[in-house]
């Protein structure tokens, strides 16, 4: 399915679905979860670099990424899923700014 591509292309229904199934569960999981995922994606999916940036143990990063998968159904280490999660974060933040 091309959900993130459709959402990024401006499909309002796709944006709503992506935000609801990926971004909102991340918000509900807490700031640490969202910060960990964002840092992980920014660091090229490196557990070690993410742990260093967040001043936590790599096992903490692993645990939080498992929680991301449990909450969203997307696996951050998978390239396609990571892209989908990144799109959801961007679109969710934009939607929050618009109110």
Residue ranges and their predicted role:
Residues 1-99:
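Cytosolic nucleotide-utilizing catalytic cores of signal-transduction proteins
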